[in-house]
């Protein structure tokens, strides 16, 4: 009887070992890249942020406006910014879930040019269900954002470049989903509750 390699336990174990080794090698590369480039990544003037200009702890969030777990994280992030921690939270749009994710990301970045990024960001994050163009522009209109200017600014090459940079950065860091947080140079994949975020922040401050 012929046995296919994939049915051979020894071959399967060998494949698993190779995969594990490859993942460890990739993680080492990711860590090295992040160590060497964290300051530049954290302080990119094109990326919207809230908090201190000279923080003790920097949080970078990769998010998607259609991501339910990202929406849940908004409350925790907002609460952290109200706390006594000396923080900076940098928001990296990573629109991977739907075409409307990219539209929403462009709209928020364009709203930044009218001083309304965080207002629109919060409105989009608090919306229930999947986004569409109508919902996005209704939210912008409600916030008294100039829609004609917004739509023109959404087409600007520098806004597309921000999204492409975020996507390239996510690729280099092996970030595959949202939300993903980078906290003082360490990557945390998935949603983090407020208590967990506080623990990570306090440990990071003690280490610095």
Show the residue positions of the predicted features.
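Extracytoplasmic thiol/disulfide redox context detector
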Residues: 4-99, 152-177, 202-208
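Cysteine-centric redox/oxidoreductase cores and disulfide-bonded domains
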Residues: 95-178, 182-208
């Amino acid at each position: 009887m012929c046995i296919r390699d994939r049915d051979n336990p020894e071959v399967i174990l060998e494949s698993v070992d190779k995969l594990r080794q490859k993942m460890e090698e990739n993680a080492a590369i990711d860590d090295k890249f992040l160590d060497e480039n964290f300051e530049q990544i954290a302080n990119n003037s094109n990326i919207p942020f809230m908090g201190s200009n000279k923080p003790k702890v920097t949080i970078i969030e990769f998010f998607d406006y259609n991501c339910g777990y990202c929406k849940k994280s908004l409350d925790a992030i907002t609460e952290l910014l109200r706390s006594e921690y000396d923080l900076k939270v940098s928001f990296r749009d990573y629109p991977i879930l739907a075409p409307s994710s990219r539209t929403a990301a462009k709209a928020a970045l364009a709203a930044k040019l009218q001083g309304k990024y965080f207002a629109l960001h919060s409105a989009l994050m608090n919306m229930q269900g999947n986004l569409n163009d109508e919902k996005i522009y209704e939210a912008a209109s409600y916030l008294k954002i100039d829609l004609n200017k917004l739509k023109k600014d959404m087409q600007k090459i520098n806004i597309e470049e921000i999204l492409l940079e975020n996507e390239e950065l996510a690729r280099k860091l092996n970030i595959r989903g949202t939300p993903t947080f980078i906290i003082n140079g360490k990557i945390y994949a998935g949603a983090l509750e407020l208590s967990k975020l506080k623990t990570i922040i306090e440990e990071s401050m003690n280490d610095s």
